[in-house]
Curated annotation (Swiss-Prot):
Signal peptide: none annotated. This is Glutamate--tRNA ligase. The keyword Nucleotide-binding applies. It is found in: Cytoplasm. One of its GO terms (cellular component) is cytosol. One of its GO terms (biological process) is glutamyl-tRNA aminoacylation. The lineage of its organism: Bacteria, Pseudomonadati, Dictyoglomota, Dictyoglomia, Dictyoglomales. PROSITE patterns: AA_TRNA_LIGASE_I. The gene is gltX.
Length: 477
């Protein structure tokens, strides 16, 4: 496909939503697959709600996901003269007209139409104003909006994903393209931008289907060839309603803070509404680019399932090298304030991660799993200790294993296991009667990685100290 040009055009009226990220990703994959151009356009004409903070969040979120753009960002507020120029052109052609109706008048006529069971479209009152009436409105200080003259008949377009879609023009009515304050409406600005930026494919959510006929009227009024349209399925919550905050986290920034990998979120979002030919679920970004095909996008909505995202994140964490995992988890580890930065031992941390990597579902979980590798003063839970130390001779056996382990010249998992099993055999006790209490002694947890591997990473000195402390704790019960 030659000279593909697509865009993502967020409004900076909120933080980057996973739905916007989903649309951005599909545009980006389409551009990269076809060696085309991906453009970022900031639609900031909602002056009351647009903020710099939201804009920066959107830009940083796209960068974090790796969705870098080739052109932009372009800003609609910097193009107001351009929109006015094209609106004036339509006025001159007689394809648009000034509308002096006030919001109150429009609302009254809308209610009247609904009461008469008619569609509440504009009644073209201002299309037929005399020069004298216009002059009177001007003297009253009314500032006119500009409406497009909608042609009669039907509007049909072919959607790449949904096939042929048809609209009755009379159901739409003449709509405003420039507001009375000189700001263009969404549909007008979008068409001018897409045309002047040479957009070849408009790939967006299905909630924009109803905007398409209005945009086609504008293309036709100028005699321009419209781009191809592809309307993606929306993301829904597990209850099949539109994804919103009540379903949990919806902002890309929050997923970053929770310790999700960008490549995992990209992998997951790509599979919402698109089915690759290959029957698997874990993909690299490079594989997604190679396989992406708009024709395999479904009409069915994508159900955003955090449990599935978590599973995909787990798989991507397991693919990381220990060095990569160390770099990515370190900011979360630092938040726990278990050590002074100048005392941080990278080599030791890599050993810790070799035990925890398989257990991490998110990067942030390092704070949940790694505490006992950095905190020596474990606060044992009495009920847990009583549960795992039911045998009255547990303190005695722990003293014995402490003595045995203190004499090991090589403090390896293999030697630790062999010596413990030998002691258990000699004393005719199940190994679990030693393993479970020792695990609690070393970690203050009842589950975790292999006990002997934990002891090896902690090292001889820490292991023996914790055993001694635990033995003394048992004597107080």
């Amino acid at each position: 496909m030659d000279n593909v040009r697509v865009r993502i055009a967020p409004s900076p009226t909120g933080y980057l939503h996973v739905g916007t990220a989903h649309t951005a990703l599909f545009n980006w994959l389409f551009a990269r697959h076809n060696k085309g151009t991906f453009i970022l356009r900031i639609e900031d004409t909602d002056l009351a709600r647009s903020t710099k903070e939201y804009e920066e969040n959107i830009i940083e979120g796209l960068k974090w996901l790796g969705l870098y753009w080739d052109e932009g960002p372009y800003y609609q507020t910097q193009r107001l003269d351009l929109y006015r120029k094209y609106a004036d052109e339509l006025l001159k052609k007689g394809l648009a007209y000034y509308c002096y109706c006030t919001p109150e008048e429009l609302e009254e006529r809308r209610k009247e139409a609904l009461a008469q069971k008619k569609p509440p479209r504009y009644d073209r009152k201002c299309l037929y104003l005399s020069d004298e009436e216009r002059a009177r409105y001007e003297r009253e200080g009314r500032k006119p909006a500009i409406r497009l003259l909608v042609p009669e008949g039907k509007t049909v377009f072919n959607d790449i994903i949904r096939g042929e879609i048809e609209f009755n023009n009379e159901d739409i009515g003449d709509f405003v393209i420039m507001k009375s304050d000189g700001i263009p409406t969404y549909n007008f600005a979008v068409v001018i931008d897409d045309y002047t930026m040479g957009i070849t494919h408009v790939i967006r959510g299905e909630d924009h289907i109803s905007n398409t006929p209005k945009q086609l009227f504008i293309y036709n009024a100028f005699g321009w060839t419209p781009p191809e349209f592809a309307h993606l399925p929306l993301l829904l919550g597990p209850d099949r309603s539109k994804l919103s905050k009540r379903h949990g986290v919806t902002s890309v920034t929050e997923y970053k803070k929770m310790g999700y990998l960008p490549q995992a979120l990209v992998n997951y979002l790509a599979l919402l509404g698109w089915t690759p030919e290959e029957n698997r679920e874990i993909y690299t970004v490079e594989e997604l680019i190679e396989l992406f095909d708009l024709r395999r996008v479904t009409k069915n909505p994508g159900i955003f399932d955090v449990t599935k995202l978590e599973w995909i994140n787990t798989q991507h964490i397991r693919r990381l090298s220990l060095e990569e995992l160390a770099d990515l988890t370190y900011p979360f580890l630092k938040e726990a304030e278990w050590f002074k930065e100048e005392n941080f031992n990278k080599e030791y941390y890599l050993k810790v991660l070799s035990l925890l990597q398989e257990r991490l579902k998110t990067l942030a979980q390092i704070k949940e799993y790694a505490d006992y590798f950095f905190v020596d003063d474990l606060d044992y839970d009495v009920e847990t200790v009583k549960k795992v130390c039911k045998h009255p001779d547990t303190p005695l056996y722990l003293e014995k294993i402490k003595d045995v382990w203190s004499q090991l010249s090589e403090f390896t998992a293999e030697n630790l296991e062999a010596s413990l099993k030998k002691l258990a055999e000699e004393n005719q006790i199940p190994t679990k009667n030693l393993v479970h209490p020792i695990r609690v002694a070393l970690t203050n947890k009842t589950v975790g990685p292999g006990l002997y591997e934990i002891a090896e990473v902690l090292g001889k000195e820490k292991t023996l100290k914790r055993l001694e402390k635990f033995i003394q704790f048992l004597k107080t019960l």
